[in-house]
């Protein structure tokens, strides 16, 4: 099914389709978050506007893709068995996940505590994680080795954020920025752990497509929306602190 083959006028949502419900809820949350981040962008200092723009892009791009993913699922569910929108989901992740990882760099860059090399290391690790995941889930490579590679890349990102240059840079920032950075690191550690769990449940002969998609949808809402809210919190706290010093 191509992107152009589905629309908001497609298959109806079945009341027993909990996966479909999770797709619809995720779509609504992504749209609401995007509107909020765009409006709040005008209330933060200039140095934070790029970070707020990226937060809005993450949820905005996700909203666009979810409008198609939910219809893909509903249409296939109506035909007898829900089909996971694998390609659409990974296209979304290929755009939004590197943007999320870049937020760590942007937050530190906003207060002058980041280097370009940090950005490229985080960006590269996120691509390795995504490419390995897609190759494994699509059957183009062995599932478990690809899961191991993806998890290794994720653990490297966690290391950079919790113990590497990103952590060292965050320690020199304001209290509000440090709090937001730590909260984002928790989301990266705990929230992103949902993805390999979903991946694992969707592999093998007894693959649970329903559980995989529900977990992926929950993870996307938590990680994209909550992640953006932490950026917003850091921006507003730093803006207030700067205003009080003037």
Language model feature labels by segment:
Residues 160-163, 183-246:
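C-terminal transmembrane-bundle signature of multipass membrane proteins
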Residues 62-89, 131-140:
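Helix-loop junctions on the outward
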Residues 29, 51-71, 191-200:
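Hydrophobic alpha-helical transmembrane segments of multi-pass membrane proteins
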Residues 13-18, 80-94, 213-218:
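Short aromatic-rich membrane-water interface segments that cap or initiate transmembrane helices
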Residues 34-38, 70, 90-123, 130, ...:
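Internal transmembrane alpha-helix with an interfacial aromatic "cap," most often the third helix
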Residues 3-30:
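Hydrophobic transmembrane alpha-helical segments in integral membrane proteins
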Residues 46-55, 114-120, 181-184:
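Membrane-interfacial loop-to-transmembrane alpha-helix junctions, especially the N-terminal start
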Residues 32-36, 103, 132, 153-175, ...:
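Alpha-helical transmembrane segments in multipass membrane proteins, preferentially the mid-helix core
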């Amino acid at each position: 099914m191509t992107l152009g083959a589905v629309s908001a006028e497609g298959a109806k949502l079945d009341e027993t389709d909990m996966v479909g419900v999770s797709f619809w809820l995720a779509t609504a949350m992504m749209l609401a978050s995007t509107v909020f981040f765009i409006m709040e962008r005008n209330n933060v200092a200039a140095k934070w506007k790029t970070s707020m723009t990226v937060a809005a892009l993450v949820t905005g791009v996700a909203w666009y893709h979810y409008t198609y993913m939910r219809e893909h699922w509903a249409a296939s569910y109506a035909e007898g068995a829900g089909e996971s929108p694998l390609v659409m989901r990974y296209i979304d992740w290929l755009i939004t996940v590197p943007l999320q990882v870049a937020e760590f760099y942007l937050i530190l860059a906003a207060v002058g505590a980041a280097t370009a090399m940090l950005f490229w290391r985080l960006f590269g690790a996120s691509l390795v994680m995504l490419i390995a995941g897609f190759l494994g889930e699509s059957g183009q490579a062995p599932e478990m080795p690809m899961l191991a590679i993806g998890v290794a890349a994720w653990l490297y990102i966690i290391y950079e954020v919790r113990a590497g240059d990103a952590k060292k840079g965050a320690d020199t920032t304001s209290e509000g920025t440090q709090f937001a950075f730590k909260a984002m690191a928790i989301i990266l550690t705990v929230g992103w752990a949902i993805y390999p769990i979903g991946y694992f449940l969707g592999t093998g002969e007894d693959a649970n497509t329903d559980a995989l998609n529900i977990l992926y949808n929950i993870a996307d809402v938590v990680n994209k929306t909550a992640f953006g809210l932490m950026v917003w919190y850091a921006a507003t706290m730093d803006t207030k602190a700067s205003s009080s010093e003037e």
